[in-house]
Structure formats: C-alpha cells, structure tokens
C-alpha cells in the first residue's frame, strides 16, 4: 500500500506544467542527497565483505584509480587489480560486478550520471527533444512504445541502493509529463488524427496515442490501478475532472479507455 501511494505521488506532478518543478524531481533530489551521504561516509568505512550495493560503492570509491570512464560515460573497472588489492572472494567479486553492471545500464538509459570522482547522480532535468510532427497521416507507434517500456523496466530492475520504485517512477513521470520527451499528445497534436498502421490501422488522435503509450509503457512496472489513479489525479489537479467521472478514477472515461487499451496490449505481449 505504501508503495502504491508513493508511486501515485511521483506520477502526479505537483505542478502540471512542464516548465515548473514536479514531484519526481523532488524525489530524485532526495535520493541524490542520500547517495552523497553514502559517498561522504565511505571515506571512513572499511569493507570486509561485499554484500550490498553500499559495500560495492564504498569499495569502488576506495580504489578510484582502478576505475575509468569509457567514451559513453560508462564505467570501466580493472577487476583483476581489485581482487589483488582486496583479496576478494568469488562472492565479493560477483557482487561488485553486479553493482557495476547495474550502474552502466542506468548510465546507458540516461537515468544517472557518474562524474570523474565516481559520484552518482540521478538525472533530474531531462532535456526536451526537438520533434518534427509527422506530415503523414499514417504512422506506426509500437516500435518506440515497446522500446520505452523496455527502458523503463531496465531502470526499475537496475536501480541501486533499494530505490527501484522511486527511481523508476520518477524516470517515467519526467518523460510522460506535459512537454516531456515521451508526451505524444504534444508531439503529435492533441486533436490531430492518425491511422496507426501497427494497431490494426486504428484511427487515433494524438491525445489517444499519448494515453495508449502511457498505459503500455507504465504497465511494464506499475499496476493498472496505479496508472489509472495517477491519471485521474492529474485531471483533478488541473480542474478538468468531473464528479460523474468517479467510475473512471475521476479521469475522462475516453482517456481511461485508451490507457486501458495500452495496458491490455502490454499484458497480451508479456
């Protein structure tokens, strides 16, 4: 129950407009502060066994000279030297490798950055992309939609320090919020109609496509109830809800129907 409430908080921006701060940034800032505490505390710690992300990070910081950044900003680690320097057991080494692998996935998915001093920061400001609205009225959406779902699931599966629900929820909210890089309503035009070739040639508006995408991608980590409740809270927040929408989580039933279609499509493929 606590997880559901936290997810609703993250998915519902404090300020609905993209130009202003939202709750997802606040959550990530809190996590970044906690990571900075781990970073600072690690100076005085002595790791005797590597059994957690915190242990692995502490060991990494102790031997910064054995870590370098690749051209894509992922971490390159000299594991042989780590074993020699710390007399690591096989289990210790596997835990360290697992931590590094998770960090590199998060870097690749643009969920975190790691600087030259190995300070981890979850990305709180996702730059907007310049999107040219398609001229064609026949489009396909499932390739990018599936790709986004896979990215979100990777962030969830690889979040470090036990933060998966908060981190993945923030990652999702930053991207689907109004004006976000996954906001198809803005990219395609709210009322512009398209024939979606890879959804049985369905005739859908940009708004309908955005709601479908939200449902499909979000379902990779969230329950249907969480997704639809969050959508309703957004409508309440901007004053576009109606008491007669109570059966659809106070969201417009047409929006909820498209969200449900996205959820159903994801469920049918997984």
Could you describe each region identified by the protein language model?
Residues 229-270:
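Active-site or metal-binding loop neighborhoods of secreted/extracellular toxin and effector enzymes
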Residues 215-223, 265:
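Well-ordered alpha-helical scaffold segments within catalytic/enzyme domains
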Residues 158, 164-165, 176, 227-230, ...:
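Calcium-binding acidic motifs and repeat modules
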Residues 25-66:
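N-terminal mature-domain "stem" immediately C-terminal to a signal peptide or N-terminal signal-anchor/transmembrane
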Residues 10-27:
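Sec-dependent signal peptide cleavage junction
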Residues 213-216, 244-245:
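Polytopic alpha-helical membrane-helix bundles and their juxtamembrane interface segments
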Residues 2-12:
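Bacterial N-terminal signal peptides
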Residues 49-212:
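Glycine-rich short-loop/terminal segments
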């Amino acid at each position: 129950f606590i997880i559901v409430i936290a997810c609703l908080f993250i998915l519902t921006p404090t300020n609905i407009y993209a130009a202003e701060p939202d709750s997802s940034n606040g959550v990530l800032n809190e996590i970044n502060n906690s990571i900075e505490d781990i970073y600072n505390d690690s100076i005085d710690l002595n790791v005797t066994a590597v059994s957690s992300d915190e242990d692995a990070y502490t060991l990494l910081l102790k031997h910064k000279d054995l870590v370098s950044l690749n051209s894509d900003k992922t971490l390159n680690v000299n594991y042989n030297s780590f074993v020699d320097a710390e007399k690591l057991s096989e289990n210790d080494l596997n835990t360290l490798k697992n931590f590094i692998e998770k960090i590199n996935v998060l870097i690749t998915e643009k969920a975190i950055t790691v600087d030259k001093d190995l300070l981890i920061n979850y990305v709180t400001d996702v730059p907007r992309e310049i999107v040219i609205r398609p001229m064609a009225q026949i489009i396909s959406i499932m390739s990018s939609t599936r790709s986004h779902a896979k990215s979100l699931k990777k962030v969830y599966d690889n979040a470090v320090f036990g933060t998966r629900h908060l981190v993945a929820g923030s990652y999702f909210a930053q991207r689907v919020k109004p004006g976000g890089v996954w906001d198809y309503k803005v990219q395609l035009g709210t009322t512009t109609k398209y024939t979606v070739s890879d959804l049985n040639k369905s005739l859908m508006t940009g708004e309908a496509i955005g709601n479908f995408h939200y449902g499909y991608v979000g379902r990779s980590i969230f329950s249907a109830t969480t997704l639809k409740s969050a959508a309703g809270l957004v409508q309440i927040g901007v004053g576009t809800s109606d008491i007669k929408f109570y059966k659809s989580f106070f969201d417009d039933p047409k929006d909820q129907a498209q969200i449900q279609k996205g959820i159903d499509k994801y469920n049918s493929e997984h």
